[in-house]
Regions:
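Outer-membrane beta-barrel translocator domains and adjoining extracellular loop/strand segments
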Residues: 23-29, 69-84, 134-141, 187-194
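Extracellular loop and loop/strand-boundary signature of outer-membrane beta-barrel proteins
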Residues: 24-33, 79-81, 86-97, 142-149, ...
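Residues that define the transmembrane beta-barrel architecture of outer-membrane proteins
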Residues: 33-41, 99-105, 152-158, 227-233
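Outer-membrane beta-barrel transmembrane domain signature
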Residues: 178, 182-251
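Membrane-embedded beta-strand positions of outer-membrane beta-barrel proteins
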Residues: 12-14, 58, 123, 160, ...
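Residues on the lipid-exposed face of transmembrane beta-strands in outer-membrane beta-barrel proteins
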Residues: 16-18, 41-49, 107-113, 127, ...
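Outer-membrane beta-barrel channels and translocator barrels
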Residues: 5, 48-52, 112-120, 167-170, ...
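Transmembrane beta-strands of outer-membrane beta-barrel pores
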Residues: 16-24, 51-53, 62-68, 125-133, ...
Length: 251
């Protein structure tokens, strides 16, 4: 079947932003500073389908950003052990490291039925998570430093209620009042969710534990569970407006 323009509205946008900061050696030696590169990609999609009193709005937004800076790390030998010089001082290397500073995507689906000019009733479903692995710090990006990844965590919010939409184009505020709401938190990765330890037995047969990484359970207290559900009520306020004839600025 053909897509009818009078029933469908589609918006799509995206952007790529980058910055480069560079200092020469004399400046760094006197005032300090570090050369760096930052890249951020943004994408947004909005689709609205309307038929009589029924409307369903679907939105997707995503943001992913990385930056690269020089960091000081201790040199390792062939066996992976930290190296020191004859005086016992650490042997340090300087290298450029990429590190994630922004990573999120959000999917929203909102079906509704119109009650009056500005009021409607329906539901809102929001899901958000991230694309790539997240680590403890710029210099700690190994498996034992893993803190997050896709669906660890993941958040799902479902609400039922009424929605008010402002009739003024210059003040497009949307207020959703939901007496019934459900919040779900997911942490699917066992390695991240649980505390990881290494057990060793000494010469006397005594067992000792060395922590490899702490638990990042995102509020899920039971280590054998991968999700948590909570109920309640919610209020959501949205304001989405573009400025300028070409919509160069959006808030």
């Amino acid at each position: 079947a053909a897509i009818r323009k009078e029933r469908n509205y589609l918006e799509f946008g995206g952007g790529l932003q980058g910055t480069l900061t560079s200092y020469n050696d004399p400046w760094i030696s006197v005032s300090g500073g570090d050369n760096s590169i930052a890249l951020t990609a943004v994408i947004g999609l909005r689709h609205v389908f309307t038929k009589n009193l029924f409307t369903i709005e679907t939105k997707f937004s995503a943001k992913l950003g990385y930056n690269r800076m020089k960091v000081e790390t201790q040199r390792l030998d062939a066996d992976g052990n930290p190296m020191v010089d004859d005086s016992g001082n650490k042997i340090m290397d300087s290298e450029g490291v990429w590190f994630k500073n922004q990573d999120e995507f959000v999917v929203s689906v909102a079906p509704s039925f119109k009650m009056s000019e500005n009021w409607s009733y329906g539901s809102i479903l929001n899901f958000r998570s991230q694309f790539v692995n997240g680590y403890k710090s710029r210099t700690e990006q190994k498996k034992e430093h893993l803190k997050s990844k896709f669906m660890t965590p993941g958040y799902l919010d479902i609400s039922l209620g009424i929605t008010y939409k402002s009739p003024k184009p210059k003040f497009p505020i949307v207020i959703n009042l939901s007496p019934i709401a459900l919040n779900a938190t997911f942490a699917e990765n066992d390695w991240i969710r649980r505390r990881q330890v290494e057990e060793r037995v000494d010469s006397e047969g005594k067992k000792t534990e060395t922590e490899i990484k702490p638990a990042y359970n995102y509020g899920i207290e039971d280590p054998d569970k991968t999700s948590k559900y909570e109920g309640g009520s919610s209020i959501q306020i949205d304001f989405d407006r573009t400025f300028g004839k070409t919509g160069f600025l959006r808030y």
